[in-house]
């Protein structure tokens, strides 16, 4: 299982790091873990064009998009004090907290650019959009909990 996570991490970092990388779209073959990894790697490598935010938006749950509004509002939300920590962060660690057939909750430890640690709960649920039926999407991300300075 750990080897699979390492392989997936290397694979997605390679995809996201490529300046001309095509956006990864929701697909039935992607797991809940794949979705959160795609999003976190994209946010870690966000650029001046906000490619990381755009990638993350693709995996926002369709029901949440109704609440957050269009991409422009989602982008503003990610630049808010609570979520900008995710933009160009130094590293992250993903741990499964709980799961059911249609929902996974992950604990995400993020080390910010300023080397401060934060903790988020990341909810991933099955959903449908016009291009993907029964795919995994992020349905919610908690406010961060400040875990203090890194050693």
Which stretches of residues belong to each language-model region?
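Sec/Tat signal peptide C-region and signal peptidase I cleavage site
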Residues: 17-21
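Exposed beta-sheet edge and beta->alpha loop/turn motif
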Residues: 97-151
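Sec-dependent N-terminal signal peptides
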Residues: 6-15
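Positively charged n-region of N-terminal signal peptides that target proteins for export
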Residues: 1-5
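Short, aromatic-enriched amphipathic alpha-helices that serve as compact interaction elements
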Residues: 31-47, 59
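Short solvent-exposed beta->alpha transition segments
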Residues: 50-101
């Amino acid at each position: 299982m750990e080897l699979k996570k390492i392989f997936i991490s290397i694979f997605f970092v390679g995809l996201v790091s490529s300046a001309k990388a095509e956006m990864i779209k929701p697909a039935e073959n992607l797991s809940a873990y794949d979705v959160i990894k795609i999003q976190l790697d994209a946010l870690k490598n966000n650029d001046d064009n906000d490619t990381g935010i755009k990638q993350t938006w693709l995996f926002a749950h369709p029901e949440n998009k109704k609440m957050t509004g269009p991409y422009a509002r989602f982008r503003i939300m990610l630049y808010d004090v609570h979520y900008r920590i995710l933009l160009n962060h130094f590293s992250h660690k993903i741990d499964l907290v709980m799961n059911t057939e249609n929902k996974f909750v992950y604990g995400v430890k993020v080390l910010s650019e300023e080397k401060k640690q934060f903790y988020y709960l990341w909810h991933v649920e099955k959903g449908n959009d016009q291009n993907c039926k029964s795919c995994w999407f992020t349905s919610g991300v908690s406010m961060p909990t400040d875990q203090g300075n890194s050693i």
